[in-house]
Amino acid sequence: MLHTALIGVGGFGYCHLLALEKLIHQQKLTLSAVCDVNSHFRPEWEEKGVAFFTDYRELLRSVPHLDYITISTPIPTHSEIATACLAHGIPVLLEKPPAILPEEFAKLTAAQAASGKICAVNYTMTADPAFLSLMQLLKNKELGEIHTITGTGLYKRYQSYYSGSPWLGKLNYNGYPLRDGTINNPLSHLLNNMLLLADAAGGRPISVEAELYRIYPISGEDTSCLRVLTANGIQLLFYATLGSHEQTPAKIEISGSNGSAVWQYPGYLQTAAGVKSYPPEENPTDQVHENMYQFLVNGVPLFCPLSSCQNTVLVSDAAFTSAREIKTIPDSFVNSYSVNGDYARELIGITELVQAAAAKQALFSEMNCPWAVSGEKINLRRFLC
């Protein structure tokens, strides 16, 4: 039986708790300790007989043996806490994104190498069985030479979403370049999967063009589009918004010289051979924790090791450099309304715009869109070796 701990039990930490409880029920794990800066959680955990800490450093000093530790804390703390856990010789399951800046990611990678322990990242869409099947198709070159990988994520968020944590929607937070938004938070899963598919097809990103926008009264972005080119000629097109009329599943379409494929989350894959559908998990984080357990016990490959996230961090960083700034879309292009005491904003025509842009392999600024502004093409070669 493995011994584990969780840093960050509030917010998304609850999903990790559910996953851990499932493994505990299966007698695969025991939860030795939890940590959260909010001390009001203490009585609940002490009643359960689980050690509770408000400082992760105290947890690391006080708990002698842990087989792995899960970090589900605000984005600005991810790399710092993960580095400390690795320095204590503890394997880490880290909430996404692992880092915002390439130099921050490089330090975390160095810390992992020095520790000799693994750091896995909770990009839950990498655990989707339909996505894993698609990855294998590309590795086997069953679609031939890949030409385009197009990802769309039309999500809907309300104003209350940004009240969930003080850092949500922030471009910077307490001096940290947080860059919260579609690229680094809700739709980062989609971007990460696209780049993993490109990598499976031998594609290393060499340039990025990006456009970043906002319709909500935030400092970060809530709408984006990117064009990424790889050294072997693959073009990736990423379209995302949190201002859709209704939320639709994240989707990736792939075009190759020998066929095409469509993946939709969760559990849908369409190829020339037909459609495969997999039953969705009630809590996708379950699969990630089961994978972590199987890696530690049986050596099963991780869905998303830290090393596989490098391109995502590089592309995300380049996107903000390319866009130069986040452009506020004028209210004349936005619908605003109240819903059950909450407040919603929708970008008028965003679904049709994304569909048309994807069909033309174009960015918003290339579609005669009145509010769109083009970005600079950023060369990534200097980051790659």
Task: Put a short name on every predicted segment.
Residues G10, H16, V50-A111:
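Beta-loop-alpha module in the N-terminal Rossmann-like domain of NAD(P)-dependent dehydrogenases
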